[in-house]
Every structure is written in C-alpha cells, then in structure tokens.
Amino acid sequence: MMINIQEDKLVSAHDAEEILRFFNCHDSALQQEATTLLTQEAHLLDIQAYRAWLEHCVGSEVQYQVISRELRAASERRYKLNEAMNVYNENFQQLKVRVEHQLDPQNWGNSPKLRFTRFITNVQAAMDVNDKELLHIRSNVILHRARRGNQVDVFYAAREDKWKRGEGGVRKLVQRFVDYPERILQTHNLMVFL
C-alpha cells in the first residue's frame, strides 16, 4: 500500500510513513504482545500505582511528549507558522517529579481521590526495521477521570510508542508521542498520564 501525499494533500508525510509501517505487518503474536503491554500499563495507571508504572513500564531513557496542534484552513498553510506546541516534553526524571507530585499528601487535586478508567483502542504493532529490540506501537486512548459525582473529564488522543527490550527480556517504554487534539482544554487541567 502506498499513499501519494502530493495527491492526498490532507495526509502528512509522517502519517503516510506510519500507515506503511503498520499496514505491512501481520504478526498476531506481536499484536498480542503490544496489546498486553498497553493493557498492563493502563491498569497500573488506572489504580494510580505510579511508582510501579515508572519501575516496570518506563525506561530510564524515555522521552514522553504530548503535543497539541493548531488546525488551520488550507489558505493559511502557505505561511510557515508553528502548528504544534508541547504540552509536555519530559524525560524520566521529569516524569518522576510529576509522579511524586501526584503522590504528595498536600496535593489538593487528589482530595477526594480521583478515579481513572482508560480505554486503549486501535492497537497496531510493528518491529523496527533497523533495531529488532524496538517495538513500534500505535494506539488511541480514551481516559475518563472522575472526581466527586459531578466533576468528570474525558481525554482522548492518538499515541505513537516505542518499547525496547532490555534486561531480562522485559520491554519498557522509551518513547511516547501523544497527539492531543484539543488546542484549548475543555477540562480543568491535563495533570494525567496519557
């Protein structure tokens, strides 16, 4: 399958490359491994076991990036304006600080306790062409956050992950790129792990 981005002008070069990577991979064992990794990670995050998430799922060299894009009319695309902005662009140490903030008893945002439910969908997996220890996973996430009976937020995003096999054959997240579609947040905050 090939996408001609000159003809299909709405498709970015990055998206065309990604669809080609996953479209040609038909490995059901790899797909199952990817689904298991994401399901286990989602469970740890849902129960707010953040330290366990860092220890068991996240590699020390991780790059965790959440961006938001500005969607422009076709007539505005001729200008070289920055379309994306970083919401988060963190490494392992910065994620660790954010985890400690979440666990701080003085963090008023967690009182009363928050409840999370994640839905991970559209999971696609493919091995890296050059590094056989690197697994590419594309997925969509819907995150439901509830606090009290009347304060509910729903987040949704597309994710592109890289999971690398390390010591003991365990895969850990080394890169997560989250494309968050809202330019203006409809929620109270984005203090969540997507």
UniProtKB/Swiss-Prot annotation:
Gene name linked to the record: ndoC
Pfam families this protein is in? Answer: Ring_hydroxyl_B
Tell me which species this is from: Pseudomonas putida
The outcome of changing K132E is: In strain: G7
InterPro entries on file: NTF2-like_dom_sf, Rng_hydr_dOase-bsu
Q: Which domain of life is it from?
A: Bacteria
Q: In which pathway does it act?
A: Aromatic compound metabolism; naphthalene degradation
- What UniProt keywords are attached to this protein's entry? Aromatic hydrocarbons catabolism, Dioxygenase, Oxidoreductase, Plasmid
Per the record, the GO terms for biological process are: 3-phenylpropionate catabolic process
Subunit info here reads: The naphthalene dioxygenase (NDO) multicomponent enzyme system is composed of an electron transfer component and a dioxygenase component (iron sulfur protein (ISP)). The electron transfer component is composed of a ferredoxin reductase (NdoR) and a ferredoxin (NdoA), and the dioxygenase component is formed of a heterohexamer (trimer of heterodimers) of three large alpha subunits (NdoB) and three small beta subunits (NdoC).
Note the SUPFAM superfamilies from the entry: NTF2-like
Upon changing E17Q, the result is:
In strain: G7
UniProt function note? Component of the naphthalene dioxygenase (NDO) multicomponent enzyme system which catalyzes the incorporation of both atoms of molecular oxygen into naphthalene to form cis-(1R,2S)-dihydroxy-1,2-dihydronaphthalene. The beta subunit seems to have a structural role in the holoenzyme. Also able to catalyze the cis-dihydroxylation of biphenyl and phenanthrene.
Impact when changing M127R = In strain: G7
Q: Name one GO molecular function term.
A: dioxygenase activity
Family in the record: Belongs to the bacterial ring-hydroxylating dioxygenase beta subunit family.
User: Consequence of mutating V99I?
Assistant: In strain: G7
Q: Which Gene3D superfamilies match?
A: 3.10.450.50
What is the protein name stated in its UniProt record? Naphthalene 1,2-dioxygenase system, small oxygenase component
Question: By its UniProt entry, which CDD domains does this protein fall under?
Answer: ring_hydroxylating_dioxygenases_beta
